[in-house]
Amino acid sequence: PLATKLAVNDHSCVNAATQWAGIAALEGPQDAVDEMVRAFDARRKLIVGKLNALPGVSCVTPLGAFYAFPNITGTGKTAGELQDLMLNEAGVATVAGTSFGALGEGYVRFSYAASAAQIEEAMSRIANIL
């Protein structure tokens, strides 16, 4: 199918312009990277602190990406139940851990690729429903 052909070419035949852009990004100024690292570190600390303050929730500090994956078993809800509750009652989108396999039960994934203000608002909304 067409999608397969596109994927094969996209994954194995990266065009020259994209390759040159990648080189420029790697060899160019890195000050933006340092700024992003600091911003994501602050957001990570914020969300982990807020998650650990929620009743029945326990979150270790993630070491990569921009996702927190707290244990929610203390809430008495399944991952799917809590995902739905947060979306429907608090307007906060998360991903049930079971979306990543059966061993994800008891966990919900949060993204902290958002502003600190958005994270604060989301955590406040969740605190109001738990």
Which residues make up each language-model segment?
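PLP-dependent class I/II
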Residues: 1-130
